[in-house]
């Protein structure tokens, strides 16, 4: 089968969740199908990144976005009641480029990621499957609820436009996929139960307990792209609300915040002597391996948290919130600990750091859980079956 994959970002390096998902889906699908990759990108894609995908793609086409035209499109969408981010990714240049590439490839099926790319492919004559990835409108709504002033107004506008786009997707595509049941239920359509659940997986060969050997320099680690609003919110909440309660009982407890592109507000958290902000890490496994406990106090966002899958695969005891655990489906008190306020999170952290036997039990149980439920080969299987079914109609 000839699959044309359409992405809003080049899927390498793997510092963002959408890139990680797309990369591993491409790797798995390429074992049995021909992959043609079309990406729009507002950043220069390095030759090294292209080469990382080359073994899995018959052809790769990257269309560089003009930021000035993107900005003009955002303004245009504001005044025409359309999603701002969809305007950013869908300029006349990107639409012409996609149509030309589609004519060249003549695929059996088009598979695009996120509503951001919907305007590129919605009118294609070929069978089409779109991956919502997660409920982007729900993510935006959660951010809106915690914002103030002009930004609250902008997010409220974008929330309404994304809800409309998610609803309209049912009219344009032969099938739709999403990362979790919770995200599917948040899509505003009476047929949201027909969306195919395609979870993420974890690379067990890469993320394994003995993958790297480094000293345990930190007690706690939180990893993620530190320019992404849900991660920024979680990091600040951890340092400003949770850690003071932990330090009241364990004054010497140390915390590592690891991940690409930290915002200024994240760098400032490192002014506390017991908090280290690393920025980009060449091998994120070293951040996990250098710490005793993984904590992800997610307050906003949507979808399945890859960082939790990776930490559990590295056999780390984990603490998170219900928001992150509902898509994951782990058992509180067995495979990880869940807390939805600073006091409960702090109690779990102190218990795990003070009780080696408990920490080991949670780590071992979580490790078994991800191995039994989150391999990439199993995760991509329902997607492959869906693509085959759409082509066979």
In which residue ranges do the predicted regions lie?
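Conserved acidic donor-binding segment of nucleotide-sugar-dependent glycosyltransferases
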Residues: 336-343, 351-356
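N-terminal subdomain of nucleotide-sugar transferases
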Residues: 1-62
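Acidic donor-binding loop of glycosyltransferase active sites
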Residues: 174, 289-303, 314-317
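A short, well-ordered alpha-helix in the C-terminal region of glycosyltransferases
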Residues: 358-372, 379-382
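Donor nucleotide-sugar binding/catalytic pocket of nucleotide-sugar-dependent glycosyltransferases
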Residues: 137, 155-209
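Acceptor-binding helix/loop patch of EC 2.4 sugar-transfer enzymes
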Residues: 8, 67-84, 129-167, 225
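Conserved catalytic-core segment of nucleotide-activated headgroup transferases in glycan assembly
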Residues: 199-290
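Short hydrophobic beta-strand element within catalytic cores of glycosyltransferases
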Residues: 307-310, 317-321
